[in-house]
Amino acid sequence: MIILSVETSCDETSVAITKDGKTVLSNAVLSQIKIHQPYGGVVPEIASRAHIESMLYMFDKAIKDAGIKVSDIDLVAVTQGPGLIGSLLVGINAATTFAYANQIPLMGVNHLLGHIYAAQIEGEMKFPLLTLLVSGGHTELLLVKDHLEIELLGTTLDDAVGEAYDKVARMLGLGYPGGPVVDRLAHQGEAIYNLPKPFLKNEPFNFSFSGLKSSVLNLVHNMKQRNEPFKVEDVCASFQESVTEVLVQKTKDAANNLGVKQIVVAGGVAANKGLRTKMKERITDLEILTPSIKYCTDQAAMIGIAAYYQFKKQGALKDYYLKGSSAINFI
């Protein structure tokens, strides 16, 4: 089964061609990072306009790179949410138009489901499994019992982990996107500052990073007030040590309690080298499945893989009406 998939939930424009829920025939991705860098973050209206400008080119590139014809496509899948509503609508309208014009079945896919199924591209998901989903907008622990059978165990009570990284980067004047810069600098410094590790004892599966973020702000502010010299690398290392310790320990505890066969680490923050390293060092009795870096970030291949399994269980839409949502329910 050949699927054309579209992903425009935030600031990456991506169109992919996948086959049988496993093989990626093409995965065209166009990042808008340079467009948004002067503003210190994603500007929704600018993101939407950039998607519009590149959409036709990305459709053409994905089909050509895959070496297929439009008539070979069995299903069109598109990210339905969550995400920036303007960006989502660009992708949905493009996918719907393409599907209707060529009379190909259409399906909407949850963006977060796509992140989970990115692990299936280069590995083999073994159920039941535990997923740590970490991104700029989400931090969740999920019990995946089978294909599309997902139970939300815990989530963030305030800042998502990727959001916390970006805010700390902004405090330190590191620019946008901040997460990769903090990760890189953390490896050049030492975790010499004793920052809090918010484990939330009464809520073992939930997360909270706002207090840690505030502690970093206070630490830097106080050192500047005292004219005390400090290395940004050490601040980054201390922050990352606290974040990864919480993420890894909560994941380990949940896996032990639930008796899962595998752990999947997914989402944009799954590209973080500190997290990937600590996860493998601390959890040695279970297989840890983490997508390669190119499949951690937003791209359409993961949407195509998820769509294959969703189609097998639910089928396609009965018509070509698809509504986007910035806060679509995951479960």
UniProtKB/Swiss-Prot annotation:
Keyword hit for Transmembrane: no
A GO cellular component annotation in the UniProt record: cytoplasm
CDD domains named in the record: ASKHA_NBD_TsaD_bac (cd24133)
Cofactor binding: number and manner: Binds 1 Fe(2+) ion per subunit.
Keyword annotations: Acyltransferase, Cytoplasm, Iron, Metal-binding, Transferase, tRNA processing
Positions that bind substrate: 133-137, 166, 179, 183, 272
Stored Pfam families: TsaD
Signal peptide, first to last residue: none
Localization: Cytoplasm
Domain of life: Bacteria
Cofactor(s) listed: Fe(2+)
One of the record's GO molecular function terms: iron ion binding
Family to which the UniProt record says this protein belongs: Belongs to the KAE1 / TsaD family.
NCBIfam families in the record: gcp_kae1, T6A_TsaD_YgjD
General function of this protein: Required for the formation of a threonylcarbamoyl group on adenosine at position 37 (t(6)A37) in tRNAs that read codons beginning with adenine. Is involved in the transfer of the threonylcarbamoyl moiety of threonylcarbamoyl-AMP (TC-AMP) to the N6 group of A37, together with TsaE and TsaB. TsaD likely plays a direct catalytic role in this reaction.
Protein name: tRNA N6-adenosine threonylcarbamoyltransferase
Classification of source organism: Bacteria, Bacillati, Mycoplasmatota, Mollicutes, Acholeplasmatales
